[in-house]
């Protein structure tokens, strides 16, 4: 069991904010950016970058474009009722990078998340193009803070008929939806982990962001097992629809009650599992709901000391099909 003084915790935060966050992803065909915050009235903005690592500049005679060219479709998903989405296609040539300010790129979505999917530039088909990487910078002007978070990449797995740009079709059933079922694309993880958090206080605060692709009609449960410095375990439950960014104290008071000396900053961690997702219209239940997550932590007395990243993960979520399509797909079957 180890503890940090308040001064030591501040130094740890300073180092964490200065270093690049670890990247456990590899070039993929789908990128998911967990936070889009373009509330300009509150001094918030998000810078989104997408990079095409394909280097093939040989001209494709079918498209008259370099073979490594890809169309990427940005799907901005509104994180509040009615949880609608809008899409914007962009073209990336080999070794190209596109960086946009989300609020200018799509002013219709102030708060939510973003999915970027590789497509053939001539017919909009979903393609196996595992060359995309990306990240985002969430800017808090009022708090003088920025947070850099890598996009979470999902590789295309299906290798269907060759498309005009030379890439293989990723959409096996041709429904225009990216299905994270271990056949078309990689599955979502089974478990998430918050590897560490400081006890919440006047000087430390953090939040978690969760993303689910089940659509606006599902209330998604999240099950927490929280551990303190003494390895004591606390279980808590939380619910959201589609997307949420919630303070740790909005989940449970355990996050500010880890015990120990008042002169020492206590540290804990937690295991996070998607629980039951209930359709609020039909009552249908999806067990072990697939979710993604990201974290942000701040040291409040020090401007600029904010650091975040994707939650650690393990396993594969194996929830399968529903009467209206796959459990885990985008666009979701419950949205238009």
Name each region found by the language model.
Residues 19-336:
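Gly/Pro-rich, tryptophan- and cysteine-flecked surface segments typical
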